[in-house]
Amino acid sequence: MATLSDVAKKANVSKMTVSRVINHPETVTDELKKLVHSAMKELNYIPNYAARALVQNRTQVVKLLILEEMDTTEPYYMNLLTGISRELDRNHYALQLVTRNSLNIGQCDGIIATGLRKNDFEGVIKAFEKPLVVFGQNEMGYDFIDVNNEKGTFMATRHVMGLGEREVVFFGIDLDEPFERAREQGYIRAMNKSFKKSNMFRIDNSSKKSECLARELLKSMDNQAAFVCASDRIALGVIRAAQSLGKRIPEDVAVTGNDGVFLDRISSPRLTTVRQPVVEMGEACAKMLLKKMNEDGAAQGSLFFEPELIVRESTL
């Protein structure tokens, strides 16, 4: 069985360097890490991470707290889980999924939280003693990862404006949260840029609700229309409403969504959407948390990912 000394000899480095690569990878260069990991792989050397955790007084467990109700019809959180677990696995950490009622079961070294609303910061989150990273923009000073929601909706609105003269309506989610306000602001900025009057509605994040509202609006519209929606789910309801009235998509009614993780690909016609790189964002959450844990809880700030406008048949 290979030893740490064997790895050091194979990589032509000191035992101290091998130990640093294993126990404190953030303190060594990528070149050194690659060299040592290559030697470990060649010698089939497996570090004792349980012993390391014991010495460092760590559990090697990170909790993912989801405070939002998960919809089994779309894999948004599965994509997030994939990204988080992928990065944690690279660093030999286990991921424990917890809810509001199971949060305090078992120990952990840090927490990633998502689906938070304003009252959660004063209640659940304020009681945390472990390093925390939030998936989703917040205004409470907590480190977070998110997509540039304002830019995404701005791009979608500008896109439908390029389809010709038509009334551009925004269907937002009825939540007074940073991500929703940012999406609304993107629409408003695009409308103002073209000196157009905003026409905004806030509804539940439900395709049934959006279908009912869109049907009533479309009945009263004489001109071509475009609906910029704050979620793919809302956009699907708009498409159904237009089709039920015999409207052509996109000739009569153009529709865009937001999220781009599943529903956009099963709609007919396929939905133009603002894609969030959720897997990559999940990886970034884990990276930020691990760095925070290694820096004794030091603040990490925020990171915004760039959205991507995926143009499909609902606006083509």
Curated annotation (Swiss-Prot):
InterPro entries: HTH_LacI, LacI/GalR-like_sensor, Lambda_DNA-bd_dom_sf, Peripla_BP_I. Keywords: DNA-binding, Repressor, Transcription, Transcription regulation. The keyword Metal-binding does not apply. This is Uncharacterized HTH-type transcriptional regulator YvdE. CDD domains: HTH_LacI (cd01392), PBP1_CcpA_TTHA0807 (cd06297). GO terms for molecular function: DNA-binding transcription factor activity; transcription cis-regulatory region binding. Pfam families: LacI, Peripla_BP_3. Residues 1-56 form the HTH lacI-type domain. Residues 4-23 bind DNA. It comes from the Bacteria. GO terms for biological process: regulation of DNA-templated transcription.
